[in-house]
């Protein structure tokens, strides 16, 4: 492949989705520049990405709220565009600590946007979320659904989307793509990188795999009285490698044509219940996964899955990994790294 020689800043590039996206960037010929404060990620992830790709990666241990340090990276970096992952993402914690979430996710993004504007780097791929749809009345969800978050985390994504729309409306040089993720699962097929929450996991799959491997005595399932086929919540689980590739498709689109500000769903278009995912992981791991039903979690919705047809039509992207792939790769990562990156 001919080198593209584009330097792409990746905020939060040491995190779960960020690290997988960095691999795809390198494979597509881009040069990633990672900016991460390592608050919920690990330097080991970057080392392993270097091992997978055979490339040395530029890394800056910088918080996006540190305006001076971030400014210096833009000054010297010759950055063409930015993929913005950095942010806090625990729904439950956001209900308890809303100011922390508004400060980090909104004020931090404003710091980044001001510097991008200053340095005339006006192309952004933003890591949004399906939480901006709140509790949808019908599924599948299209991008023109009404937006209303049910928790502070979702509201931070919603507010940033509004800021980006205002920015693009005020200045035609700005181009932003907002990727509304559904539920990322799985890991790189090498088993070298995957989801390694430093504290309490925010996503279902680490709970399931940690229970299967014996790190947790029992899996708690939040509610079995939803209006779904088996009573447990239904979600659009998407393989993290598919999600990462979606960012490359978005970046390619940003670089090739005038966008304005556009939102895309990144999902499979298929919902699986929590119990279905537990069953699939049980098959992949050949392990028993004891579970208990506990009360619903505040802010959780019954069913959420995407209509991803707009991303296929306009970005040429679609998810290719199925449920078995997701569970196989999640289990490979967990079984090879029982304690995550701290095993290294």
Swiss-Prot record:
A matching Pfam family: GDP_Man_Dehyd
Record-listed substrate binding positions: 129-131, 181-183, 202-204, 220-222, 235, 297-300
Record-linked Gene3D superfamilies: NAD(P)-binding Rossmann-like Domain, UDP-galactose 4-epimerase, domain 1
Major enzyme class: isomerase
SUPFAM superfamilies in the record: NAD(P)-binding Rossmann-fold domains (SSF51735)
Catalytic reaction equation(s): UDP-alpha-D-glucose = UDP-alpha-D-galactose; UDP-N-acetyl-alpha-D-glucosamine = UDP-N-acetyl-alpha-D-galactosamine
A GO molecular-function annotation: UDP-N-acetylglucosamine 4-epimerase activity
Alphabetical keyword list: Carbohydrate metabolism, Galactose metabolism, Isomerase, NAD
The UniProt record lists the keyword NAD: yes
Catalytic residues as annotated in Swiss-Prot or TrEMBL: 153
Cellular component terms per the entry's GO annotation: cytosol
Description of pH dependence: Optimum pH is 7.9.
Binding site for NAD(+): 15-17, 36-40, 63-64, 85, 89, 157, 181
Family: Belongs to the NAD(P)-dependent epimerase/dehydratase family.
Job of this protein: Catalyzes two distinct but analogous reactions: the reversible epimerization of UDP-glucose to UDP-galactose and the reversible epimerization of UDP-N-acetylglucosamine to UDP-N-acetylgalactosamine. The reaction with UDP-Gal plays a critical role in the Leloir pathway of galactose catabolism in which galactose is converted to the glycolytic intermediate glucose 6-phosphate. It contributes to the catabolism of dietary galactose and enables the endogenous biosynthesis of both UDP-Gal and UDP-GalNAc when exogenous sources are limited.
NCBIfam families linked: galE, PRK10675.1
Name of the protein described by the UniProt record: UDP-glucose 4-epimerase
Organism from which the protein derives: Dictyostelium discoideum (Social amoeba)
Name of encoding gene: galE
